[in-house]
Structures are given as C-alpha cells and as structure tokens.
C-alpha cells in the first residue's frame, strides 16, 4: 500500500499553529544532550516567536548552537493525534520589524489583551525561530487516507 498522506494542508498548518499555545523547544547542551523546554509562542509570517530568560540554559545553548527543533502537538487518543515538527535556527529578535505585532498577538493569546509585565521582564529576550523544515501529521485523516488509497489501488488494478 502507498504511504498515506496525513500532513496538514497550508491552511490547516496556519490554523493549527495559531491556535496552539505551547511549543516544546529542543536545544543541544555543550555535551550534545537534548534540552527540552515548553515555551509559549506566536506564529507570525511563517515564523515562531517566543521569549525566554536571558542567560538560562536554553538561551546559552542557542548562543553556542542556534539549531533547534520544536514540537507542537494535540490529541490524547492515537486516532486524534496531530502535530507539527519544526527544524531550524533560533536567534534573538531584537531588531525584528514584526516585534510590535508579535508582542500584540502574544498579549492577546496569553494575557487576555493586557500588556505583559515588562517591568518584571527586564531579563527576558524575544526569540525568532526560522523554520528550515516543517513536518506535520494529523492522524484524524487516517480513515479517509486509507479509503483513498484503496480507491486508487482499485482504479490502477494494483
């Protein structure tokens, strides 16, 4: 049987990444071990924006090696699982022209529209995660994908 296409369409990907709240970001320690942390994020212009504490393990790892992988998923039962795996580089977003939009969307998503407590955030840094490769899956599509594969096989006589 041919491989089933369970990937998210571009519209589904945009919707999924806009709705999800947490990315699990994996960076590499100096010895090469994975360091995985959950972070809140916003998806703006095909880029993941998040913030973290300056000088923590995550930001130190990224200063040494900006390569990272992020996992965003949803669902509990196997047939409900869906998600996105992003591979790319993470960098500080200090001069990014989209930062005001990012802050506004972040505030709406996580603070109910209130501005973040910047007076307590003096040691926070905004990060930009630029995807190099995105993989997605939606196991809710399995029944239809199997039915399509069967129809295709029947049509080709395979």
Predicted regions and their residues:
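Short, basic/aromatic recognition patches
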Residues: 2-24
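Short beta-strand segments
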Residues: 20-54, 62, 70-73
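Amphipathic alpha-helical interface surfaces
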Residues: 13, 58, 64, 98-102, ...
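Short secondary-structure boundary/capping segments
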Residues: 14-15, 40, 60, 76, ...
């Amino acid at each position: 049987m041919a491989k089933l296409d369970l990937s998210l369409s571009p519209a589904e990907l945009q919707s999924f990444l806009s709705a999800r709240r947490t990315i699990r970001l994996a960076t590499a320690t100096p010895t090469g071990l994975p360091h995985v942390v959950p972070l809140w994020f916003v998806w703006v212009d095909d880029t993941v924006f998040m913030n973290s504490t300056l000088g923590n393990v995550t930001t130190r790892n990224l200063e040494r090696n900006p390569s990272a992988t992020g996992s965003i998923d949803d669902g509990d039962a196997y047939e409900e699982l869906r998600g996105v795996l992003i591979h790319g580089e993470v960098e500080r977003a200090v001069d990014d022209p989209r930062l005001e939009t990012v802050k506004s969307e972040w505030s709406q998503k996580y603070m109910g529209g209130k501005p973040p407590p910047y007076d307590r955030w003096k040691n926070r840094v905004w990060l930009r995660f630029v995807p190099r490769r995105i993989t997605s899956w939606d196991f809710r599509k399995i029944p239809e994908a199997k039915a399509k594969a069967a129809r295709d096989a029947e049509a080709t006589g395979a």
